[in-house]
Amino acid sequence: FLDRALRSEFTQYGRFFKGGDLLDLKWMWDVVEKEYPLNQADLFANHPEFYMVLTHAISGDATYIKASKDNILDGLRASSSIPVLTRQAVDIFGEPYFDGGVADALPVHWAAQQHDVSKLMVLRTRPKNYYKASSKGDQLLAKYVFQQKRGFAKSLLSRTQRYNDSVQFARSASGQKILEVCPPDLKNMAGRLSQNKAKIRYSYDVGIETGLKAIEDWKNL
């Protein structure tokens, strides 16, 4: 990650200002798949119920796609394609998709409704005390960038409330046991577009530590 994520092929502000993607996720996924191919035979050997949450680039609706050998690579690329940072949606079976963060950033409501789900692990990328504030940026994007895609624009304007509702649900739902896993609120954590190797390495190590603790907490839930 410290190598490929910091290469100029991946992040290019010059390309972005000329109308291209800031983050070339197709290049990243192609490189990673070539060098470290996903072992799909093992992944799907036991027919797991594995879903990817995406946002339809036109309607703005959340789409929950069951992973298969035919869609997993494009689905994972779509699930990391953040609108604006990546201008082109990812085509999956003829439909355009972006990351699920617009329509359903924390799909805990949907997961809780699935058959035989008695406990859930909710992985957040924000500290525990974080709630999403109303964003003028979302309002501007909805009005000017996505004005021709009214469904997506409408979904963008309501995502703050959906996110905060999901956080509250994760902490108050009575039907399931829910483990909420959050990164610690530390100043040295890397931001989304960080190019600082030390911060990225530190954040990775914090993530490993947090993940190991989450595994133990899950066993005891």
PLM regions: where:
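Patatin-like phospholipase
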Residues: F1-L221
